[in-house]
Amino acid sequence: MNSGRLLGKVSGARLFGLAAILLGQVLSQTGNSVAAAQTGDPEAKRGHGAPISIVEQGSFFVGGTEVTAPGKFDPTVRSASDAGQSFPIDHLYAQYQIPEHARRFPLVMIHGANATGSAWESTPDGREGYQTIFLRRGFAVYVVDFPRRGKAGFPSFNGTLGALLDKQVIPNHTNRKGDQTTFIGLRLGPEFLEYFPNTQFPKAGLDQFFKYLIPGVMDDENVIVDALAALLERIGPAILVSSSDSGRFACLAAIRSPNVKGIVDYEGANQPFPVGQAPAPLPAYDGFLVGPGAPVPLEDFLKLTKIPIQIVVGDNIPSSPQPIPQLENPRIRLIFKKQFVETVNRYGGDASLLLLPDVGIYGNTHVPFLDLNNLEVADLMSEFLNEKGLDEQDH
């Protein structure tokens, strides 16, 4: 269901929108002090704008499957048991807001590895995140949590992590990035707590930023893409806004679903190449081979040539090999990004790589949408959407 049909079915939408305005008038008087309280930084007062008229908002789960444990369910047993019980797993969680007079295509914001949709909601220092920025710009916005994390939950039952009686549904271990790895790997600075001199990272929100990242279980791209395709089937044509590892998932979702009308990708990784045309792995400083994204059949890859794609990359990516893997990976991944764009365009597509320093914007991290200049970065996305005819009003 697209945003236009959603607006049409809600008879009380105008009343709801009025309530949102009245509530917003109250909240706008306190929002600044709340943001400052979150971080202890008076500068966090900036960035909270006027009230927004929202005609519909909510959340739902979509996609996934169900597993049933062998045995017979016995309701008289007091202790928790999987026997004979069914469990929904591998669904996606989406929350959405639809503004008055929404544009034709909603934005679906997809988080990266070890993260959740909270990365789009607000910045670590309490400023408005992309969810609100683009809501203000007239887009319906859907923010998701992948299957197996966040509000979508993960497949675990009664007992050992991920085990349904004697069947291991997901591996019995998790992964998580620590503060030190996060600081260097997301390019806040070359060493822990040593910021790049020109950094745009909101330093007052560092503690909040570390808490954005959560433990993860195995990411299965088929499970994630299945869920994204189910979401797109439900909401209709949309624009995907991806980050980091979800750059690949956005591409695979576009291959799977004709409802993807464009992709804006913030430092995405592992984009696919056609079978037989993937670039060779590249050696890192220590000799470790870093490969490109797994290939897909050419007929699938060609579907990516039918939509506009923009990959946005921040600053402080080394130009020469580095002994620290967290700094090496962005250097090598940038090479693969360039090759992906070249390959799409060689087949007649419309892909572009936007290096922020090339347009005079410096100091951005791996997550430019959270940085101090995220409004400036958002302006570039708005320009791209306008140039590609993706910001038309819904009629």
Task: Give each language-model segment a name.
Residues V241-A250:
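Gly/Ala-rich beta-loop-alpha elbow adjacent to hydrolase catalytic centers
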